[in-house]
UniProtKB/Swiss-Prot annotation:
GO cellular component labels: outer membrane-bounded periplasmic space
Species of origin: Salmonella choleraesuis (strain SC-B67)
Organism placement in taxonomy: Bacteria, Pseudomonadati, Pseudomonadota, Gammaproteobacteria, Enterobacterales
Entry coiled-coil feature ranges: none
BP GO annotations: thiamine transport
Full protein name: Putative 2-aminoethylphosphonate-binding periplasmic protein
Main function: Probably part of the PhnSTUV complex (TC 3.A.1.11.5) involved in 2-aminoethylphosphonate import.
Signal peptide span: 1-21
Length: 337
């Protein structure tokens, strides 16, 4: 998931848009669920249009970028549905960009509330070149080894959601912000440099240009089919514990949405059992509904990858409040201002 790109994708031809004015729903979404020719989004949008006659207009951008666009359009909203990741969904809620809406699936989705709901589970992950490294780096301390100098890269906090996740994971693994920042300052000696895109790092690892990079589980599992030298790992802390920050895709209804009822219909459709059952099959994500357990091979691979890894999440409201200050401090400790 990245924060730098904003692109308008028309899911269906809109030549007759004026006559369809009330049969359209506009989605502003973070990337990741519309990748490939037969993505989860594409399949669900097609099925939604077939069932309702409502065309989906799709705008893709970074988690922060789509929220910023909503804020700029506050007096004249253009979107009906927002999909982003924490802490950007919390920022949207705090800025009153989201409308009250309890989804039909709320009782089956942990952490759903009246402003937003998790849509697809996802987790921070790390990748390494298994052709050049016999084993994955076992611990965070291993990544400080001189053999990784200019062979390690992680995406930049503030530019990439997964880069922000690395920063938060360091706070968690080392027990405090101070200790996490101290570690990231040391790690900078091996870091190739800034990267606005997390997804592009996978090809560099596969080629052996770098040995280690960050990512997210859904994206990395999908990319491994095209990048055979890449494997996933999670470094352990000094107690030998491996953990992964949960960074789900989250969905909400836009405040003042021009087609609010259509937005509600689409949200309920994407959170339905039928749609959730196919998210792993089509996009390597994991369903958020407690009453859905897919049986496809992608789901089995994702759950197997997480064996022995403890998932966790911070208080995202607190993260949203301190994020700007934390990113500024990251730039200082890494001397990357």
């Amino acid at each position: 998931m990245k924060l730098s790109r904003l692109a308008l994708l028309s899911v269906f031809a809109l030549a007759s848009a004026p006559s369809w004015a009330e049969s359209v729903v506009t989605v502003y979404s973070i990337d990741g669920l519309h990748d490939g020719d037969n993505s989860w989004y594409q399949v669900q949008f097609d099925a939604f249009t077939k069932a309702t006659g409502i065309t989906v207009r799709y705008v893709e951008g970074g988690g922060g970028v789509v929220v910023e666009r909503l804020a700029k359009e506050r007096t004249n909203p253009q979107a009906d549905v927002l999909v982003t990741a924490p802490p950007f969904i919390q920022r949207a809620a705090a800025e009153k960009l989201l409308a009250n809406f309890n989804t039909d699936a709320a009782s089956a989705i942990p952490d759903a509330n009246n402003l937003y709901s998790p849509l697809v589970k996802n987790y921070l992950s790390f990748i390494y070149n298994s052709k050049l490294l016999k084993t994955a780096p076992a611990s965070w301390q291993d990544l400080l080894d001189a053999k990784f100098k200019n062979k390690l890269q992680y995406s930049t906090p503030g530019q990439a959601a997964d880069g922000m996740a690395v920063m938060l994971q360091a706070f968690h693994s080392f027990g405090s912000k101070d200790a996490g920042f101290a570690y990231l300052g040391k790690l900078q000696a091996n870091n190739v440099g800034p990267s606005a895109s997390t997804g592009k790092l996978t090809a560099l690892v596969n080629k052996g240009e770098i040995y280690v990079a960050n990512g997210d589980l859904q994206m990395n599992l999908a990319q491994m089919e095209r990048n055979p030298n890449v494997k996933i790992f999670w470094p352990a802390n000094d107690k030998g514990e491996r953990s992964a920050l949960a960074i789900p895709y989250v969905i909400g209804l836009v405040q003042g949405a021009p087609q609010s009822e259509n937005g509600k219909k689409l949200i309920n459709f994407l959170l339905s059992k039928e749609a959730q059952t196919r998210v792993s099959e089509l996009s390597w994500g994991m369903p958020v509904r407690s009453d859905v357990t897919p049986s496809d091979e992608h789901y089995k691979a994702a759950t197997a990858a997480l064996e022995g890894v403890q998932s966790w999440q911070p208080n995202w409201d607190d993260v949203a409040v301190s994020l700007s200050a934390d990113i500024s401090r990251w730039h200082k400790v890494t001397e990357s201002e």
